[in-house]
């Protein structure tokens, strides 16, 4: 019989607020450690989560899904989800958003089904094809005009291409790239109440700081913040060529 460690998620699962960020990141680090360092099966208990914001949910999806794909073991993680009768608020955040389905999509065919069913949470390693399905999904609800659609398409395209061109360009990721591709995880939807479109993308590569600065040593928060600001300034690029470094403007333009 397989013994599983149970990891209980914090009730307020959020990285936006400094009040909840520490507990949430600590929990996510535990998940990652058990799966990819210890290679131990776990059960993630989300049953008492009251609030799960989009960014934190996406981080959880990415870490769980990466382990499922790399280990070729969809069932290395099991879940306790909120019960609608006992925890309706948590059920709305975890189940109704499709997060619960995404967390159980531990194979490439299952991930493809998320795209076909136009789920909020998706994953891909192919910018050329996934951009179109994402835009189609958003536009079906948002009904953007031509200018808005162009701005959004350009921004999302550049974000996806950044992952493909920069996030995993290091020898440390050679085996990962061969196994699951230069993969990202995303969450996208149109909110009719706010009349706004949301697109969040996350990868598990080296990060902007190391990619842009090609920095290998230890760093501090202010140093990383300054480099990220520089990387998102028009004309700056890790390649150092003047004709490049415009992609960050495409990403910022729809905001």
Segments the model singles out, each with a brief description of its role:
Residues 95-135:
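Internal, well-ordered alpha/beta segment that forms a basic, Gly-enriched binding/recognition surface
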Residues 140, 214-255:
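Flexible ATP-lid and adjacent glycine-rich G1/G2 motifs of the Bergerat
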Residues 63-66, 144-192, 248-254:
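Conserved ATP-binding N-box helix of the HATPase_c
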Residues 104, 209-210:
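Short helix/loop capping segments that flank catalytic or ligand/cofactor-binding pockets
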Residues 203:
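Acidic ATP/Mg2+-coordinating residue in the GHKL
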Residues 195-199:
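Short beta-strand element(s) in the Bergerat
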Residues 2-103:
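N-terminal assembly/transducer modules of large multi-domain enzymes
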Residues 206:
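Glycine-rich G1-box
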């Amino acid at each position: 019989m397989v013994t599983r460690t149970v990891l209980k998620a914090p009730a307020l699962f959020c990285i936006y607020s400094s009040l909840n960020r520490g507990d949430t990141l600590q929990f996510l680090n535990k998940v990652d450690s058990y799966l990819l360092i210890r290679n131990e099966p776990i059960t993630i208990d989300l049953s008492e989560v009251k609030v799960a914001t989009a960014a934190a949910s996406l981080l959880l999806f990415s870490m769980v899904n990466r382990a499922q794909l790399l280990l070729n073991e969809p069932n290395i993680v099991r879940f306790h989800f909120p019960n609608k009768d006992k925890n309706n608020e948590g059920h709305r955040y975890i189940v109704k958003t499709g997060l619960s389905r995404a967390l159980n999509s531990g194979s490439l065919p299952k991930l493809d089904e998320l795209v076909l069913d136009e789920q909020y949470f998706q994953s891909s390693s192919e910018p050329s094809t996934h951009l179109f399905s994402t835009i189609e999904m958003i536009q079906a609800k948002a009904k953007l005009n031509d200018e808005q659609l162009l701005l959004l398409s350009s921004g999302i395209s550049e974000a996806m291409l950044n992952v493909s061109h920069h996030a995993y360009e290091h020898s440390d990721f050679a085996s990962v790239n061969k196994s699951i591709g230069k993969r990202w995880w995303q969450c996208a939807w149109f909110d009719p109440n706010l009349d706004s479109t949301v697109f969040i993308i996350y990868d598990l590569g080296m990060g902007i700081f190391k990619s842009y600065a090609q920095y290998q040593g230890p760093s501090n928060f202010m140093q990383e913040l300054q480099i990220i600001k520089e990387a998102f300034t028009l004309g700056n690029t890790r390649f150092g060529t003047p004709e490049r470094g415009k992609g960050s403007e495409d990403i910022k333009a729809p905001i």
